[in-house]
A protein has these predicted regions:
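FAD/FMN-dependent oxidoreductases across multiple families
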Residues: 1-97
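Long, low-complexity C-terminal extensions of enzymes
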Residues: 60-170
């Protein structure tokens, strides 16, 4: 509140939440949607996306023929992959922080990250290459700015889609 211009409209309320996801979003004849399937964080609108993606996936994979064990396994694998990519994007914001004014921010900067995110960070550090996977919610234009590094080779990174136009000017 120290940086707030003017008086606060009300006292801030602490809202506690637990992050995570179900191991099986589709289990037997039940498919969890929304907050019953998992929760990542309150600042991005990822929950809305995950609901829409879950419903779309279920419509595409609905077991009209009766059997559903293989479909449920595939549904769960795709859902888990989607949760993990979104998780990586959120963790990246904390991991790459330049803040070190509190133990919280130092712990974020020093934390161990999932292998999938560690690879993404290493590739970007080494080459300035940022990418969007086929099923990633966040595009290159979202990943690249978060992955910025002061005086880094990544400054020469050209966002996908702009390369053709740039090549035409050379």
């Amino acid at each position: 509140l120290s940086n707030l211009r003017g008086d606060p409209l009300f006292e801030p309320r602490l809202i506690r939440y637990v992050t995570g996801r179900r191991r099986k979003i589709w289990d037997k004849n039940v498919v969890a949607m929304g907050l019953s399937s998992g929760f990542l964080e309150p600042l991005e609108s990822t929950s809305i996306h995950l609901i829409q993606a879950g419903v779309t996936r279920l419509i595409k994979m609905f077991p009209f023929g009766g059997g559903f064990e293989a479909l449920a396994k595939r549904y769960n694998a795709q859902s888990n992959f989607e949760f993990e990519r979104i998780r990586d994007f959120i963790i990246l914001h904390y991991k790459l922080t330049e803040r070190d004014d509190t133990p919280f921010w130092r712990a974020c900067r020093d934390m161990t990250v999932p292998d999938s995110l560690a690879e993404r960070i290493e590739v970007f550090r080494e080459s300035g290459f940022a990418w969007q996977g086929a099923d990633d919610l966040f595009s290159v234009t979202s990943w690249a700015p978060v992955q910025r590094w002061p005086n880094h080779i990544g400054a020469r990174c050209v966002i996908a889609g702009e390369l053709d136009g740039w090549c035409g000017t050379v």
